[in-house]
């Protein structure tokens, strides 16, 4: 078997499963208020190297995972995430009912055939929840 054939066989058994973005956050309380209370994510884990160390936290909702990090060098402020959803109108209604004082998002119908709900976290990261126009 040649090196190429061996690589081809290995590649056939490899499956890329998912990506988990790391978003930079600067204030734990604000991050919790936005991601947990407002967007409805749950905490999967929290890690600190010691009591006063920066937080690294895994959150999820409906199988979508995001890592939030206070560590310098993790993530870049102003990151954009496009999140495919089913039920963007229902998500809009859910968020509107929470009356988060820093956010009043709306749904936009894009010319490329998507309905999008865009929110910005307190750290400048943009999350675009998107579904195809029916």
Regions found by a protein language model. Name each.
Residues 2-32, 79-81, 131-134:
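N-terminal beta-strand motif that seeds the catalytic metal site of vicinal oxygen chelate
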Residues 3, 26-29, 81-126:
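Vicinal oxygen chelate
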Residues 13-15, 22-65:
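Core segments of cupin and vicinal oxygen chelate
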Residues 22-24, 45, 111, 118, ...:
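Short beta->alpha transition motifs characteristic of CBS
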Residues 42-45, 68, 103-106:
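A short linear hydrophobic-aromatic micro-motif
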Residues 50-55, 75-77, 110-115:
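Short acidic/glycine-enriched loop/turn segments that link adjacent beta-strands
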Residues 59-62, 119-122, 132:
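Active-site beta-strand termini and strand-to-loop segments that position acidic
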Residues 67-69, 128:
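Conserved beta-strand in the GNAT
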């Amino acid at each position: 078997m040649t090196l190429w054939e061996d690589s081809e066989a290995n590649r056939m058994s490899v499956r890329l499963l998912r990506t988990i973005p790391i978003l930079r956050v600067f204030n734990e309380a604000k991050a919790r208020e936005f991601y947990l209370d407002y967007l409805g994510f749950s905490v999967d884990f929290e890690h600190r190297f010691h009591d006063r160390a920066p937080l690294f936290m895994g959150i999820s909702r409906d199988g979508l995972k995001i890592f939030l990090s206070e560590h310098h060098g993790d993530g870049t402020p102003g990151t954009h995430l496009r999140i495919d959803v089913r039920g963007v109108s229902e998500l809009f209604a859910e968020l509107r009912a929470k009356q988060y004082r820093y956010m009043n998002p709306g749904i936009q119908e894009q010319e490329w055939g998507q309905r999008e709900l865009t929110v910005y976290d307190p750290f400048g990261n943009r999350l675009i929840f998107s579904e195809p126009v029916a």
